[in-house]
Amino acid sequence: MSLDIDQIALHQLVKRDEQTLDVVLRDSLLPANAVVEEMMAELHRVYSAKSKAYGLFNEQSELADALKRSRKGDEDFLSFSRAATGRLRDELAKYPFAEGGVVLFCQYRYLAVEYLLISVLSSCNSMRVNEQLDLSTTHYLDINRADIVARIDLTEWENNPESTRYLTFLKGRVGRKVSDFFMDFLAASEGLDTKAQNRGLLQAVADYCADAELGKNERQAYRQQVYSYCNEQLQAGEEIALQELAQELPKLGEKDFQQFSVEQGYALEESFPADRGTLRQLTKFAGSGGGLSINFDALLLGERIFWDAATDTLTIKGTPPNLRDQLQRNSGK
């Protein structure tokens, strides 16, 4: 992995009691040795694999102002990280779920892009066996379950300040509150809505097929082509590019898919991240509620599965063998 660490600092938040969250500040930067590089490579991998929300700094963001000073050399990285940890403590202390943790600030380069990653990492206890086969307790950073993480694409931020996607953050296991606290600390607002972009893409595909008056099978085959491209991009960690997608798809009528999307005003970005859950709707129908969960391939609608809109009734002809076996055993037949 081509990841080069420029500067990295660690500090700590210690929860003394229910009302007190203390700060322990390190006096020097961490050396970028092999252990540190391995840790950052793992954190980068874990973060890159997770679903993220996008944002941008507010005009009055203290963190953004301090980061600009650090980038210009008016303030060193250690001082920047120490002051930011204090602000982080002040914001986190407002929430009842506040816990301590190791606060990490790392400025690094990956594939010619500069990043600043900020995270609060929890420590976990485990057991280890030494060479004499004695057991002892050990502590480790729980990187795989890190959920308080934000990353700033410094290259994008400095070269394209009007961007709505240079800042990313995780939603977190405890839900919306983590997002709120981190956005308050960063003094940022949500930017590019990835799910909305993917929903817009699905609508554009549906309208494009309808405009061309495709039959059911032709329409589903076209949707499958869209899904195949998008899924390949997702697996490769790449974004959906409208122009590239249009080149992959057969032209329906006089306009290709990109021209149609632009003229019809779907407000799609030239490229945007793929959202797995939304894209799945291209090839499947799924829903749950009231103790019922249903998921089936779109091709089955009208063949083995029939929906009566008037009575809101779904009829399934031919149940899966494992489901049929359960039903038979439960009915005593």
Curated annotation (Swiss-Prot):
Keywords from the UniProt entry: Cytoplasm
Name the InterPro entries on file: Nucleoid_associated_NdpA
Give the top-rank taxon of the lineage listed in the UniProt record for this protein.
Answer: Bacteria
Q: Which GO terms fall under molecular function for this chain's record?
A: double-stranded DNA binding; single-stranded RNA binding
| Alphabetical list of Pfam families matching this protein | NA37
Subcellular location, record wording? Cytoplasm, Nucleoid
A Gene Ontology term for the protein's cellular component? cytoplasm
Member of which family? Answer: Belongs to the YejK family.
Name of this protein: Nucleoid-associated protein YE1421
- Species source reads Yersinia enterocolitica serotype O:8 / biotype 1B (strain NCTC 13174 / 8081)
